[in-house]
């Protein structure tokens, strides 16, 4: 059967829980509004759920251009881009970026939740972050995602993993942007270029997984046995790491919708 787009996931705030969409606008940085916000520590270094599993417990959604953050135990906070503060330099992996700080109440909200001084920051249109040139074309850019505009995983790949696990895991542990149907597990490994709806994407690099999938998205607690990464390591290890999913770079703008056909072009 031909592949189709089965779900779309946007993560407005880096490492927080995201939102599932019926349709989305694709831009050069990925899904519109995806990972434009993140938290940084007192030294300006980015913070993720790798170190703070509780970030999974934050729900991040967009209301027009405003970011809304909520948890089960704290009041919802709304951050409007028109209320941003000073510009500061921060570190995201090896990149040094100029970003805008959020309002003071946003910093206080996030600091209280994480139990340490942090600042909420926003990537605006004045700052440009290049994709790794080893896998990109000149001018390709990315938001505050780890390295690439989008991540695609087939449901068949997750099914293949769950068939090896005593306790099944959810797709959201792997934080995909796009989930597609496929006839066999890891079919996406062989794709080089695809079209979803009217938008084309280059499939540029397998995704090397870190410890984040071991954190339960509903509790924020890391699995004491190291699953599912322990099992993935047994059959998905390569010279570049433990691979699961494919990173994409869009080659045009447009709207994609759940149910759109996925056409393999190369």
Listing of model-derived features with the role each one plays in the protein:
Residues 1-266:
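Metal-cofactor-dependent catalytic cores
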């Amino acid at each position: 059967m031909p592949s189709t787009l089965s779900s779309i996931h946007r993560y407005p705030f880096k490492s927080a829980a995201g939102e599932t969409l019926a349709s989305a606008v694709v831009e050069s940085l990925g899904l519109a509004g995806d990972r434009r916000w993140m938290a940084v520590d007192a030294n300006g270094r980015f913070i993720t759920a790798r170190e703070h599993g509780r970030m999974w417990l934050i729900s991040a959604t967009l209301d027009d251009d405003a970011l809304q953050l909520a948890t089960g135990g704290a009041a919802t906070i709304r951050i409007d881009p028109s209320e941003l503060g000073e510009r500061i330099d921060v570190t995201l992996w090896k990149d040094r970026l100029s970003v805008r700080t959020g309002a003071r109440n946003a910093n206080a909200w996030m600091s209280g939740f994480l139990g340490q001084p942090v600042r909420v920051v926003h990537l605006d249109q004045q700052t440009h972050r290049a994709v790794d040139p080893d896998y990109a074309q000149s001018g390709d850019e990315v938001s505050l995602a780890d390295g690439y505009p989008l991540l695609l995983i087939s449901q068949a790949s997750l099914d293949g993993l769950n068939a090896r696990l005593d306790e099944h895991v959810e797709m959201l542990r792997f934080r995909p942007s796009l989930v597609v149907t496929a006839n066999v597990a890891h079919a996406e490994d062989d794709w080089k270029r695809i079209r979803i709806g009217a938008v084309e994407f280059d499939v540029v690099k397998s995704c090397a997984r870190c410890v984040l999938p071991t954190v339960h998205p509903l509790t924020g607690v890391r699995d004491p046995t190291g699953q599912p990464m322990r099992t993935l390591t047994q059959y998905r290890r390569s010279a570049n790491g433990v691979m699961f999913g494919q990173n994409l770079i869009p080659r045009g703008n447009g709207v994609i919708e759940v149910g759109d056909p996925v056409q393999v072009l190369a």
